[in-house]
Amino acid sequence: MKNINWKEEIIDFLKTLLVSFLVIFLFTKFIAKPVRVNQNSMYPTVLDQSVGITNIFSVEVLHDINRFDIVVVQTDDGKNLIKRVVGLPNDTISFKNDVLYVNGLPMEQPFLDEAYVNEEKAKYGLFTNDIEEITLGPDEIYCLGDNRPYSKDSREYGPFRESQVIGKGIFLLYPFNRFGGVE
């Protein structure tokens, strides 16, 4: 029978634990952060109570934010919101009769679920209330939830500063039937 050196075993275990914590810390500090959805504002794209991770590397290092990206923004009161970017710095945006206008040009929104939009239009007449023309500043973005009738977004909070974006995109881990990246 082999004699177990408990001191070495404990030291090996503590080393493994320390390395694991270090890897997790570095991963969540520089690459991706966990996110949990506590709202229906992105339905049906992302369901309430979904859990995933968001890419912070693209935002922190590459400063890569594009129109129609899904982002995680932090409000001034510290809430994290998952929204879609519809307006970029210096854009002029508006909504009229459910049409998004960017710099005066109508924009398609292919990411919206057409059946769901039509269902909500039948209930409320519009899916997205009209938004008066707004011109964004050099570091501002305008974000909306995909579930426009139920979303608290830039229409309520105003434009977000690019520095308020803490992650780009979401890779869903739960629910398991939606496992994978979200567009």
Locate the predicted segments by residue:
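Hydrophobic membrane-insertion alpha-helices, especially the h-region
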Residues: L14-F30
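Aromatic-capped interface at the extracytoplasmic side
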Residues: L26-M42
